[in-house]
Design a protein with these regions (language model features):
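Conserved small/polar residues in nucleotide/adenosyl-binding loops
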Residues: 237-243
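Generic structural motif
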Residues: 9, 41-43, 105, 133, ...
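C-terminal or mid-to-C-terminal helical accessory/interaction module adjacent to the motor/catalytic core
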Residues: 138-214
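Structured, non-catalytic alpha/beta "coupling" segments that mediate domain-domain communication
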Residues: 26-52, 191-233
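Intrinsically disordered, low-complexity regulatory segments
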Residues: 1-159
Length: 244
């Protein structure tokens, strides 16, 4: 049998319908030589700092920076049931190969690979790469499944991004929180985005209305423009251009 793993239940249901996996089980669909199951977003993620050392449970400036030599991964408590379902399916002797059917992108690749590796699965898998859940698109995708190795670099890029977010978030948040004695959350994307909003808000709050003029001069095919003139002209000089 072939085990297909989607990113979320709704996608799993759409794929199962096309493949003929119509028998509903606890956490998966089965039928027509297919088992279709799903993740629930990120089932596996990087462990918190306290998982590396108990002393990191308390935020201290002296412990920074925290940079793991070997990364640990964990499954959130509310997602452990579905992770166990996937583990059991991967170990099912009837399953000979898998299809990664998570979203076609960097994060989708990461979601599947972390589950696959955390489960200790070594069975071969192919990649379904589609951008639509129309029945015809799903059929076309399964007719042209891609080799998993084509997406190894995509997975590595996603994993590097995840680790970078962890390093910036854990260390930045603890640094500024301990320095200013209040929780200040820092993120690789969140913080610069917030800075842009603050900068924009500052410009709006200090904005003062000003009267200005835009001067336009046109003659035949010639156009001249002077923008943002602060002072209104009290006299005018006329320029006569020769015509041809």
């Amino acid at each position: 049998m072939i085990l297909v793993i989607a990113e979320k239940p709704s996608v799993g249901a759409a794929i199962g319908k096309v493949l003929g996996a119509s028998s509903r089980k606890d956490g998966y669909l089965e039928g027509n030589n297919y088992i279709v199951s799903w993740c629930v977003g990120h089932l596996v993620g990087l462990a918190d700092a306290s998982s590396y050392d108990e002393r990191f449970a308390k935020w201290r400036y002296s412990d920074l920076p925290i940079v793991p030599e070997e990364w640990l991964f964990e499954i959130p408590k509310d997602k452990q049931k579905q992770f166990k379902v996937l583990c059991d399916l991967m170990r099912d002797k009837r399953v000979t190969e898998l299809v990664c059917a998570t979203d076609a992108g960097r994060e989708g690749e990461l979601i599947f690979r972390l589950v696959y590796k955390k489960a200790g699965c070594t069975k071969p898998f192919k990649r379904l790469w589609i951008s639509s859940l129309e029945d015809s698109a799903i059929r076309e995708g399964f007719d042209h499944l891609r080799d998993s190795s084509e997406y190894d670099r995509l997975y590595e890029a996603a994993l590097a991004r995840s680790k970078a977010d962890w390093i910036v978030g854990i260390n930045g948040t603890r640094l500024f929180s301990t320095l200013y004695h209040k929780k200040l959350v820092v993120g690789r994307v969140q913080t610069p985005t917030l800075a842009m909003l603050v900068e924009r808000e500052g410009k709006i709050s200090t904005f003062h209305k000003e009267k200005y003029f835009n001067v336009h001069i046109s003659k035949d095919n010639l156009t001249a423009e002077l923008e943002n003139v602060k002072t209104e002209a009290v006299s005018y000089t006329h320029l006569t251009l020769p015509t041809t």
